[in-house]
């Protein structure tokens, strides 16, 4: 600590001491520290104790924390291990760790992209012109392409049908070549995930084909492309991707857990898995709930669902799976659980595909009969077309992946 007495005021002034106003004393009672900049001034006979908050230069001035009136003036140089210095360093490093991301999107994912941007000030929405030539092939234009040089760039894709995959792949392959700092592909639903089996000679595993295509996305200046996807169908599919892409596998289960905790009967919930595959995938994330496991058995030409283990009697049973298409398995599981005494039945899937509007098969339980309807059917917004169809149609509720994606873009 270096003390400066009033006798050395002239010398102190040459060191650019702060000039305090008559209201300086009120600053000491503020809950947050006040910052004063050094400037050449005469100290006169006034003695004030100050503490140096930071020794960094800001536009030629040094910043202080005002401490108190006192005698004499003291300039305190905090060492690197002091709490104030460490807190300042932590705050500065925290702000520097948040990266700004330019987010592009397909036509189908505009609504989800806007929700993602609303979740983070560090994500900026960018646009692409999606047009077609007269022959039907895509006519694409990335707006302000030079403006994304050196930026972190992400693309929110939706491979909802083979018709849109080619035009989006064209953009996905082009963006990393625009001198971007890094490139992240967000594909909430990996669409060919159910096509990974080769049971007969001649079967084509299209899941592996798409994984190979994505593995060959050009590298950006920062290195390989990052891929963010949610609840991919078969666990072994994570090994389909090559070494030139960095897959980040996320899950929608945390959204479900948060929603279940908000229910009035949250202490009476059991989780049912429609088959062993769903149990292997999700049981560790939901292990604090009582578990019911169903399976399919063949009876002649039919396959029926039975309860393998667990008790549904008097419980609010939530059927959990990664995706639903026609919904036949879920409906059979619902009937079996109701027959075993479930008080309520709800369902959750991360990806509600529902081809040919099969979502209409699921009705709301309005009479207290779980065999006839569901209390809730939760899906995420990974499939944008489905969300538009089921929005505000009970028993469906949409749990948005926007917050999870915004967090993943900061990895």
UniProtKB/Swiss-Prot annotation:
It is found in: Plastid, Chloroplast. GO terms for biological process: nucleotide biosynthetic process. GO terms for cellular component: chloroplast. Its main location: plastid. Residues 314-329 are annotated as: Binding of phosphoribosylpyrophosphate. It holds the Pfam family Pribosyltran. InterPro entries: Pribosyltran_N (IPR029099), PRibTrfase_dom (IPR000836), PRTase-like (IPR029057), Rib-P_diPkinase (IPR005946). Its EC number is 2.7.6.1. It catalyses: D-ribose 5-phosphate + ATP = 5-phospho-alpha-D-ribose 1-diphosphate + AMP + H(+). This is Ribose-phosphate pyrophosphokinase 3, chloroplastic. It comes from Arabidopsis thaliana. The lineage of its organism: Eukaryota, Viridiplantae, Streptophyta, Embryophyta, Tracheophyta.
